[in-house]
């Protein structure tokens, strides 16, 4: 199993997906938006903690800058009814620290505001992750509280919303309601998701 990859980003155009060149071999890697927007554009080397899923027709690689985020991903996919895609959506819609707080506080209502999470799934997450979440107490660093190094455009934020399943028109409409200012793409996405979930 692949647990770590270190190389250069050669393709980073679609939010949540990138190609990592490791010694001349290009690996397709899926990431959470938290990780994706912390990786700066360019040819600088980057290391990713990898979770590998082997299927009959595919080898799927999920990459994380932070080892704790990978551990949280692994805990999520152990929950009945939560697959890798939904786990990535959760980690893209809320910071690991905020998610852990929801579980500690048994705040299933807030979890239902995340894309793809219904009432039953939210309650299942709270019940099944109460014990496993203890390993993260104090371990999820401020990495995910930091903004990405550079300001990203509204277009990138809209592309990310589309990747999460929202229609382009809907994404544009909600983005126009947000004061762009000097906010990072990640901040724009968070605010957009808050608006969309409050409807």
From Swiss-Prot:
Judging by the UniProt lineage, the source's domain of life is Bacteria
Signal as UniProt keyword = no
Locate the region Domain II: 66-144
Coiled-coil boundaries: none
Q: Does the keyword DNA damage apply?
A: yes
Q: Which GO terms describe its molecular function?
A: ATP binding; four-way junction DNA binding; four-way junction helicase activity
SMART domains per record: HhH1 (SM00278)
Q: Which UniProt keywords apply?
A: Cytoplasm, DNA damage, DNA recombination, DNA repair, DNA-binding
List the record's Gene Ontology CC terms alphabetically: cytoplasm; Holliday junction helicase complex; Holliday junction resolvase complex
Subcellular location per the Swiss-Prot or TrEMBL entry? Cytoplasm
Q: Which GO terms describe its biological process?
A: DNA recombination; DNA repair
Q: Where is this region: Domain I?
A: 1-65
Gene3D superfamilies in the record = 5' to 3' exonuclease, C-terminal subdomain (1.10.150.20), DNA helicase RuvA subunit, C-terminal domain (1.10.8.10), Nucleic acid-binding proteins (2.40.50.140)
Q: Segment Domain III: which positions?
A: 149-199
Tell me the segments the record calls region Flexible linker: 144-148
* Record NCBIfam families: ruvA
Subunit info?
Answer: Homotetramer. Forms an RuvA(8)-RuvB(12)-Holliday junction (HJ) complex. HJ DNA is sandwiched between 2 RuvA tetramers; dsDNA enters through RuvA and exits via RuvB. An RuvB hexamer assembles on each DNA strand where it exits the tetramer. Each RuvB hexamer is contacted by two RuvA subunits (via domain III) on 2 adjacent RuvB subunits; this complex drives branch migration. In the full resolvosome a probable DNA-RuvA(4)-RuvB(12)-RuvC(2) complex forms which resolves the HJ.
What family classification does the UniProt entry report for this protein?
Belongs to the RuvA family.
The record's note on its domains: Has three domains with a flexible linker between the domains II and III and assumes an 'L' shape. Domain III is highly mobile and contacts RuvB.
Q: What is this protein called?
A: Holliday junction branch migration complex subunit RuvA
| Organism per entry | Legionella pneumophila subsp. pneumophila (strain Philadelphia 1 / ATCC 33152 / DSM 7513)
Lineage in the entry?
Answer: Bacteria, Pseudomonadati, Pseudomonadota, Gammaproteobacteria, Legionellales
Q: Which gene encodes it?
A: ruvA
């Amino acid at each position: 199993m692949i647990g770590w990859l270190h190389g250069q980003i050669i393709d980073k155009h679609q939010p949540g997906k990138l190609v990592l060149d490791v010694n001349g071999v290009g690996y397709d890697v899926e990431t959470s938006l938290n990780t994706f927007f912390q990786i700066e554009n360019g040819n600088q080397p980057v290391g990713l903690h990898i979770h590998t899923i082997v299927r009959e027709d595919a080898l799927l690689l999920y990459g994380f800058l932070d080892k704790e985020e990978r551990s949280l991903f692994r805990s999520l996919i152990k929950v009945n009814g939560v697959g890798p895609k939904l786990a990535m959506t959760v980690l893209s819609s809320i910071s690991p620290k905020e998610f852990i707080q929801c579980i500690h506080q048994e705040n299933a209502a807030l979890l239902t505001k995340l894309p793809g999470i219904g009432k039953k799934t939210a309650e299942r997450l709270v019940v099944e992750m109460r014990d496993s979440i203890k390993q993260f107490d104090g371990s999820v660093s401020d990495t995910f509280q930091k903004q990405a190094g550079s300001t990203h455009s509204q277009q990138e934020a809209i592309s990310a919303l589309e990747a999460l399943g929202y229609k382009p028109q809907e994404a544009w409409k909600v983005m126009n309601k947000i004061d762009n200012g000097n906010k990072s793409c990640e901040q724009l996405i968070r605010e957009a998701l808050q608006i969309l979930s409050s409807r």
